[in-house]
Amino acid sequence: MNVLHDHEACATRAEVLLVLLPGAHMAPEELQREGFVQAVRRRGLAVDMALVDSHLGYVYDGSLFERLHQDVLAPARAQGWQRIWLAGISLGGYAAMGYAMRNPGMVEGIFTIAPYLGRQPLVQEIASARAQGRSLQQWLAGSQPRNDIDTDHALWRWLVQRPQDGPALHLAYGVDDRFAAGHALMAQTLPAARVSTAPGGHDWPPWRTLWAQWLDQGLLPQRCRT
């Protein structure tokens, strides 16, 4: 995977590596053009950044999570970053959660912006169960994956049964996003403090707003190690 690096925060390696995963049909350079890197730097946050070209080709050939591990996360750990956060937009949010699901203990936290949450029939199945008064746990008990490699179903199982010692998971989305119904279901698996919304749809204006709000929560260090 191609990776754009931004290591301007500290004289030496920062304590935290923030890995940004773009959405489908989106290049890492777009995250730069839309001000995501600049927003981090304006706040003086002491993090190194890696913008990953996790494009759809890796999804189509089934190598997305393995390539993230071999090309990005495992080398980052080997180079000394022990605190790693993933931040993903749309398909990038799906990739971030799917990676954490498959690699326990590798990341400290995940920030998902308008994440893709799997095929629509599955999301509709979950929504129907909730509308009938069944809990997410009850839905899960009666639901079966399509096959042994049904990542969409596995992701929802992970969301519903996420371990207490797993990575901190945050969700943000526009209230008019075309996937907002799925986001509202995902929000039911999270503490309210880890869910934020903004006016707008599946587009950059709400994403920029939500990114800024998340950066201002104080989750990332503001001082470099001495």
Give the role of each language-model region.
Residues 1-226:
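Non-catalytic cap/lid and distal C-terminal segments of serine-dependent acyl enzymes
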